[in-house]
């Protein structure tokens, strides 16, 4: 075995152990521990505390790195390829279904990110805040493009209607329905579908629902 092979083996082991650490953090997020300590992560990962600190510099870095890891894993779920396709009813249904799937995939990590930004400001928390802002902006753009035909009918009220629809369908709102509100997935889906119909439907469509 050459020196190069030895170095490659060490690098691969380090990369594997780093992922073990970050995946342990994600497991703790899912269990409700939104700000796990390095000691807790060490116990969960089966690695020593010293090993954990080889891969992250502090608690903030631990949480931020785990969030980044999760976003890499679920990145494709942020892509909504059916933008603008189908009738209004079909577009509402596909949009709500996509948002509920996205929530299911990212909810624990999103809660941890939210919790981290509410603590004292640190370089890591500011990075998380910027990432959240970018993700929310991307979801807002998807909404605007998907329902562009409807939004153009509202004239000067279009921005206000978009803001209301955006607030209704963001991940944090869905999380409120399912966690704090105690609604089922089916009830949440119905609420989002009804809300989007009321906000974005044509006058004729809204009148039919009265």
Residue ranges and their predicted role:
Residues 67, 78-80, 103-129, 175-176:
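Amphipathic alpha-helical segments used for helix-helix packing
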Residues 61, 78-105:
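Hydrophobic alpha-helical connector segments
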Residues 1-46, 55, 60-61:
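Basic, helix-initiating cap at the start of DNA-binding domains
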Residues 101-105, 112, 122-152, 158-163, ...:
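Amphipathic alpha-helical packing segments from all-alpha helical-bundle domains
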Residues 141, 162-183, 198-207:
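Amphipathic C-terminal alpha-helical segment
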Residues 55-56, 65, 191:
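Residues in the recognition helix of alpha-helical DNA-binding motifs
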Residues 38, 67-75:
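Short, basic, alpha-helical segments at the C-terminal edge of helix-turn-helix-like DNA-binding modules
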Residues 50:
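Key DNA-contact positions within bacterial/archaeal DNA-binding proteins
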